[in-house]
From Swiss-Prot:
One of its GO terms (cellular component) is proton-transporting ATP synthase complex. It is a single-pass membrane protein. F(1)F(0) ATP synthase produces ATP from ADP in the presence of a proton or sodium gradient. F-type ATPases consist of two structural domains, F(1) containing the extramembraneous catalytic core and F(0) containing the membrane proton channel, linked together by a central stalk and a peripheral stalk. During catalysis, ATP synthesis in the catalytic domain of F(1) is coupled via a rotary mechanism of the central stalk subunits to proton translocation. This is ATP synthase subunit b.
Length: 156
């Protein structure tokens, strides 16, 4: 019976040892393992969140860059249109100014022409009166008349 008493003693010691381990040793080990699992899970979740945030930030940056390029293209297009419009307006204004200057020149030439004609008429009238006086003062014969007309033509 010695084997039985030893076996029973070992069994009781083993049961006490298991109970002691389950009561005092096992809970801190399980707690440490669970904390480590939680830290690892939190780290993985944080990594996934960071990856998602990074992707989201990259998408936002891409969208903002696209919008900025679009706005820049619109600004450039508006500037080109505005520049073309200014050039066209200035060209039109230049043409109008040129037309005004040409018209003023034509008017000035026409006025000068009319003034010269009027002056010429006055001179012709004076010469005609002078010629008529000379004809009346002289005897009217054909030769004298021809001389006077030739002199008048020479004076003109």
């Amino acid at each position: 019976m010695n084997i039985n008493a030893t076996l029973i003693g070992q069994t009781i010691a083993f049961i006490v040892f298991v109970w002691f381990c389950m009561k005092f040793v096992w809970p801190p080990i399980i707690k440490a393992i669970e904390e480590r699992q939680k830290k690892i899970a939190d780290g993985l979740n944080a990594g996934e969140r960071a990856q998602k945030d990074l992707e989201k930030a990259q998408q936002e940056i891409a969208e903002q860059l696209k919008e900025a390029k679009q706005q820049a293209a619109e600004i450039i297009e508006q500037s080109k249109k505005r520049g073309a419009k200014i050039v066209e307006e200035e060209t039109q204004r230049g043409h109008e100014e040129r037309e005004k200057i040409v018209a003023a020149g034509h008017e000035e030439v026409a006025a000068e022409r009319n003034r010269v004609r009027e002056e010429l008429r006055k001179q012709v009238a004076v010469l005609a009166v002078s010629g008529a006086q000379k004809i009346i003062e002289r005897e009217i014969d054909k030769d004298a008349h021809s001389d006077i007309v030739e002199k008048l033509v020479a004076e003109l």
